[in-house]
């Protein structure tokens, strides 16, 4: 046995992979095949031999095809990039591979496909795009693949297939759209597929309405040759009355649509320069309408047109909103005079279309719209009182000149009335005080008159400095005598009052002789 070992050595060497000159590290290279799978690569490795015809890059972490990464591989025939992390394909990513026949992009994270992603692949026969996150196929996505025979799009999230999405696929024989989110498909979308032999549409949430009249009739007339017995079971998901029924078992009279109805409120709005504006357009109907905004061209030429930006994208077929309504938001930012004019909200579905006009007026001044004053909490102000704008506030300045003048006049009149009331009250109080007099004003001072009998003819009327009347007897004696004085025995009645006696205020005058 030991003698035969040298003879087996050349055979063992032939079984080992031949490492070509310049083969990337950790990859295995054969004559025209390079295998770099499951190496946790983040980019396409450098040093791949230019003559490589089959390249395996599956089960890695490649998130982006760098520009020029595949440029040296002009002889490539088969490229396997499945089970990676690709999120997008740049336009012209495979332009340097004109001989490529098979391209596998299964199980990546592709969310969309650009129309120029497959430029240069005129010889491509098989394209695997299953297991990605594609939601829409836009018009002319596969326009540059005239010789494509198999297109695998199953297990995505495709909810909208535009009418010209498959344009250019005149050689396509197999189309797999199963296990997506398709609710409908138009006759125009399948018209370019003149060579189609196998069509797979199962496991989609089909909406059985008037838009699918053609599909049921087409399958019954001749399209069934493209469908296997399993693929013919196109099950309805809605409306609820037709759920779980096969499209082929539903009568045409049951496939109905409700034309859309559109509501925009308000129909006219005035905005200031520099503001942002949002206007909602709500639509109802069945199937869910597709809502779009557009600006109606102005009749005058040379006037700049504002571009309206749709917020939320197109709703309707596959839109993310309520089952019976569609809404689109017109969003205008930094409003200028060019934004003024007439806009139109249109809602359309298979049952028809409806439009509602909306007019935007632009205030040439840059004054910001005034917000109404916020009333204080009920506990913070008396019941029934309303907040009033202050003279210096923005709300007061927003009032008209006539209104401001009227408010100012009313305030001045109220102030004048208050001053008059205060003056009248003060004057009345002063009069009452004078009438009452100071302390001691009601006192009567009694003095002796010793020069003669007490007769009223001898009384002399005097007035003090305050104008009060006084009857004084014997003016030679001072008022307020220090000691008590006795009245003459022959004059006056007995009063028991001395010369300096103070009489209570109610007694006006009292004379003692």
From Swiss-Prot:
GO terms for cellular component: external side of plasma membrane; extracellular matrix; extracellular space. Keywords: Disulfide bond, Glycoprotein, Immunoglobulin domain, Leucine-rich repeat, Membrane, Repeat, Signal, Transmembrane, Transmembrane helix. Its main location: membrane. It is found in: Membrane. Residues 21-50 form the LRRNT domain. Disulfide bonds join 281-345. Residues 365-391 are annotated as: Disordered. This is Leucine-rich repeat-containing protein 24. The gene is LRRC24.
